[in-house]
From Swiss-Prot:
This is Exoribonuclease 2. Its EC number is 3.1.13.1. The gene is rnb. Residues 191-517 form the RNB domain. One of its GO terms (molecular function) is exoribonuclease II activity. GO terms for biological process: mRNA catabolic process. It catalyses: Exonucleolytic cleavage in the 3'- to 5'-direction to yield nucleoside 5'-phosphates. Residues 563-645 form the S1 motif domain. It is an enzyme of class 3 (hydrolase).
Amino acid sequence: MFQDNPLLAQLKQQLHSQTPRVEGVVKGTDKGFGFLEVDAQKSYFIPPPQMKKVMHGDRVRAAVQVDKEREIAEPEELLEPFLTRFVGRIQKKENDERLSIIPDHSLLKDAIGCRPARGLDRAFRQGDWVLAEMRRHPLKGDRSFFAEITAFITDGSDHFAPWWVTLTRHDLARSAPQWQAGTLLEEGLAREDLCALPFVTIDSASTEDMDDALHVRENADGSLCLTIAIADPTAYVSADSPLDAEARHRAFTTYLPGFNIPMLPRDLSDDLCSLREGQRRPVLACEVTLDADGSLRDDIRFFSGWIESKAKLVYDRVSDWLEGRGDWQPPSDDIAAQIRLLHRVANARTQWRQQHALVFRDRPDYRFVLDDHGDVTDIVAEPRRVANRIVEECMITANVCAALVLRERLGFGIYNVHTGFDPALVEQAVSLLNANDVAANAEALLTLDGFCTLRRHLDSLPSTFLDSRIRRFQTFAEISTEPGPHFGLGLEAYATWTSPIRKYGDMVNHRLLKALIAGAPATRPDPAMTLQLAERRRQNRMAERDVGDWLYARFLKDKVNAPTPFNAEIIDISRGGMRVRLLENGAVAFIPASFIHAVRDEMVCSQENGTLQVKGSVVYRQGDTVPVTLSEVRLDTRSLIARPFSA
């Protein structure tokens, strides 16, 4: 009798319209239920039956119901799926042709039904790594989740899976681009012949793509004339060529533990353009004079040229020689003189930047030592030594010169820009600083001078607590076609051109500088390019991190409950515990709050304050160094679990 009853339909519509609705992101758990996080303060419980309609990370609209005085979210509409294109592993039962896939994500454990895309003719096996795309979702009216396999990555037993899986996940190339070997382009540039000068390169022993060579001349007045010669790939790659389009798409050389995937063909990056010892190479060069205090004179000159590197020097050998250690000697008196002059350049520029700009704190680089099978045999901490600083100071000098010339003569280029504190958050930064006895005001902090003054003070403190806390109020560095300051470096402008073999933005700046040299028109870069460059930079960094996490898990699985603790720096404190970085090897581990103190109600983990309190007393602060032991290594999620060390 109630079928098609208009009054009942009206009542249902009224109840539906009166039910409150919220939008948020689904957070899954490993216990079947989940939460809908609306913002940082508010979340709603999602019971297991409702969780079957969604997956972790989905953005949904949900109805809020009250059950036994508890607010419950019932997802109704999918706003943005978490999974679209994803990597996973094939699940296949014996004597069953049906396939399913488990996404490679720590909070996605349920198998999803799947089938190969049309034309993908392969007999998939248990454990195979594949690329897939979601095709069905319960909140889209489908009965269940379903995916389509779009590509095979590698089999489950491949020891090099970390590399292939990660490159596929981040949509990065697996091999170098190809090209038909060409000749030098006719660019209408007169190249100065500098082959007689003792230029040197300083790199790691294994480096093949050497893109910078250095030469210093001392003038009669004691000033130093520095020439930075940079490899010239745009002498072979024209702006409208397919190879240039491929380089723009890749944007960067991808550096992963054990190997790299170049932005340009290896014939170019590792041979024709690489500034190899004893080989005549085309370069784009910058010449500038440094006064004794490290300041740059206004005689900056860019030009095209030919050089012949007279020595391939290695960081550690040069550092040892300058520090009076080891038995290595420069191959000639000319090379020894160049090393000494370059050391003077670095010292002068470092001193100038300490007073007028900013110098980063030295942190070691961590290098994975791999055998032929991709197994990690060791992880080596490589401190930033004097030879590294020589190259760093020369490259920063060169990039400052390019930034100034492009700004003054063109008004555009590819600039690295960092504007310091976010104006919307700067008052919070002031409050934090004042609460920690550091005088500050918002107006000053938003200026380059004010920012630099604060950074120098923070760097002088014995603890990194304030330094690490203050960073969350800062903006991220950006890539821009417009000149702008780089607060992080303490410089009024910064435009890189010193790595054109590895960075497409540097190739663009090369072409702009060449246009100035030739007196030719220069084309303003498309602003959309900067978004693509920034996204590619993010993908490359994530790929390096992901492979690193995988290798750390493999290497450290045998170190669980080892008797000797690791010293670790606390890098983050959250509601659930602390993240720490092992100083010996750079690995990041998580310490659950339950491992710190047994009574949860007696503990306050404050991300806001960067502190962890037990019974009202601060026990740990962000930036502290603490001894820890590894409690668990989870190979499936590539995560490390640690606990505070107790003797």
